[in-house]
Design a protein with these regions (language model features):
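Transmembrane beta-strands of outer-membrane beta-barrel pores
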Residues: 1-5, 15, 32-38, 80-84, ...
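Outer-membrane pore/translocation modules
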Residues: 1-92, 161-171
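Transmembrane beta-strands of outer-membrane beta-barrel proteins
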Residues: 9, 26-30, 74-78, 109-113, ...
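Residues on the lipid-exposed face of transmembrane beta-strands in outer-membrane beta-barrel proteins
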Residues: 9-13, 60-66, 99-103, 135-141, ...
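Active-site glycine- and acidic-residue-rich loops that bind
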Residues: 53-55, 90-92, 121-132
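A mid-sequence, solvent-exposed acidic-amphipathic segment
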Residues: 72, 76-119
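Predominantly the C-terminal beta-signal and adjacent terminal strand-loop region
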Residues: 124-184
Length: 184
């Protein structure tokens, strides 16, 4: 994990927008990402016939979201991911489900959560990923959002977290994270 250095490009496209009138009750978006690993060839191990294409991985999601009230928003996203090169015992093609939400506690303060679960099993039972869970607090301003969260996954790429996560939130395997985003 620590030797993995990704270059990531992502796109998100709104297909449908929820309307206040209720004529369209949901929002639907497509999210896709392509990642290229920038680590050295030695990461692939001795005796491996290495090619550039082994560095590439993909994730695709259709995000179905709904704002139920001024306080509560939820989303669910079927997920397909593909890693061109995987360690022995893992599958290249994987599928999962993501769910997330936000509850506006008061003012610009919100509780947020995300849950991701890999639905297919790996070739080796010992390598099945643990579900991912993140619980957080967000403070929003006109131009920034500050997030502090506890999560049981440590990677920056969803496709690697889905497949390789071995941390169990219920066993105390969690990390503290912090994000700052700027709105333009």
């Amino acid at each position: 994990w620590q030797d993995y250095k990704p270059l990531d490009a992502a796109v998100k496209y709104a297909i449908l927008q929820q309307t206040e009138s209720g004529k369209m009750p949901i929002s639907l978006s497509y999210y896709g990402s392509v990642s290229i690993g920038l680590q050295g060839d030695e990461m692939y191990g001795p005796g491996v016939e290495y090619r550039f294409i082994h560095r590439i991985s993909y994730i695709n999601q259709f995000i179905v979201a709904r704002k139920f009230s001024e306080k509560l928003s939820l989303q669910v996203a079927p997920t397909i991911l593909y890693l061109n090169s995987v360690e022995y015992g893992y599958k290249n093609l994987n599928y999962g489900i993501s769910a997330g939400g936000r509850f506006n506690a008061f003012g610009s303060h919100s509780l947020i959560f995300e849950f991701d679960h890999l639905l297919n099993k790996q070739d080796n039972e010992d390598f099945n990923a643990k579900p991912q869970l993140a619980l957080g607090w967000e403070i929003g301003t006109a131009t920034h959002a500050f997030q502090v969260f506890f999560a049981n996954y440590k990677g920056i790429l969803g496709q690697r977290n889905f497949v390789y996560n071995q941390n169990d939130f219920t066993e105390g395997d969690y990390l503290l994270g912090f994000n700052v985003t700027v709105r333009f």
